[in-house]
């Protein structure tokens, strides 16, 4: 019999009820092409931390100067300050201190093209809107016009050549004059103001603008001020926090206010589909305090949707700290037969903010602001999380070999792709749902090696090792398997586990 790993993590069902390829544990693996591939490691952009706080905002901006030169800038927000990054030295320099922002903010931004140049507008909900136009003086500046005296814009969007702003903790939004993001043309109150407020603008298919409130979703109709009108899409869902939404495919994934689960939104109420309720039940593992909810972030990078959040067991059970410490990840191009994601859990990457660097020579790299220290991290350049081993664990479904007979398991074959260094991975098997450590062995995942100088190179592209079960722990009628590893420098892909079983005798019921 053959067990593959194509089904994703399912934590809401008993192991014996899981379907083909589903796993009761899948930690620090990505599911790709029907196999498990260890998640890439992280390495610091700035080896010297800015301090003991995290970084909730990372931005790579691209600008075209008058002489045609392309300028790339790295920006981070840390403890109220805006910093510029030096890609060569891996250091940060504080921008003009007169432009410092409120502490404990989570900045939001949009970019507007003006005369061929990109201008970044940044909002916190506590400060005046700041802008950065790629100037050679490395300065963020206060805006002019109506924005010079406005402190409560929390997020924004460019739509129909206008800047649209959300007023913090309010149902009021403002929109600018055409091609003039710093002067407000008018304001609109969306829905009822009592017990509700706007959280985030997004732009969907057909240049349709949506406003997610905390308890409802609205769509904008019309293309000129005289036609602008917001119509309710649904009042059964709302957005839990301003970073809890991300464009994915033909719609958006968002964190719902009411049950704290992820949903897909395609533009109508009937298009809304649950993404985590059936298999993950996010509300059971995520810290549900509003501070923790405000810290979530989402992104799509190289075909994988990633959702950073704080585990509710932070500070215990091996989940560190009072900060984002986990991610839920799935391959958006490889859904399950039901259309739902095949989730895996990433633990230890400690992500507070995402940033994809994808223009003018940047190689579509993912960088993240750490949630526990003042560093930003390159992803997929190393095999570990900033020098810390990545703890990998996968546990299969409970497979019934025979419904009415005891079987003898004669051998197990783990098939995978080895790494380039000599490592072992702990292999366990569990009989009849008894999760003990009796049936365990160490499996080498290095393959055969030849020494070339001081570098060991794997000389086989595949391992398919047979493991013999313990003789007095080889009879039962169901079995599951676990692989575990927590060593530095490990690389591995796992394709399947096969086992051979022979029926021995019928199961006898006992009565007392």
Regions found by a protein language model. Name each.
Residues 1-91, 100-119, 236-252, 256-258, ...:
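Beta-sheet repeat architectures centered on beta-propellers
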Residues 46-55, 96-104, 138-259, 263-295:
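Beta-propeller and closely related beta-pinwheel folds
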Residues 79, 125-126, 168, 214, ...:
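Short strand-coil-strand connectors
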Residues 109-143:
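Hydrophobic or amphipathic alpha-helical targeting/insertion segments
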Residues 130, 173, 376:
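Glycine/Thr-rich phosphate-binding loops of Rossmann-like dinucleotide-binding domains
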Residues 130, 226-227, 422:
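Generic macromolecular interface patches on structured domains
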Residues 135-136, 178-179, 377, 381-382:
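Short, glycine/charged-enriched secondary-structure capping and boundary segments
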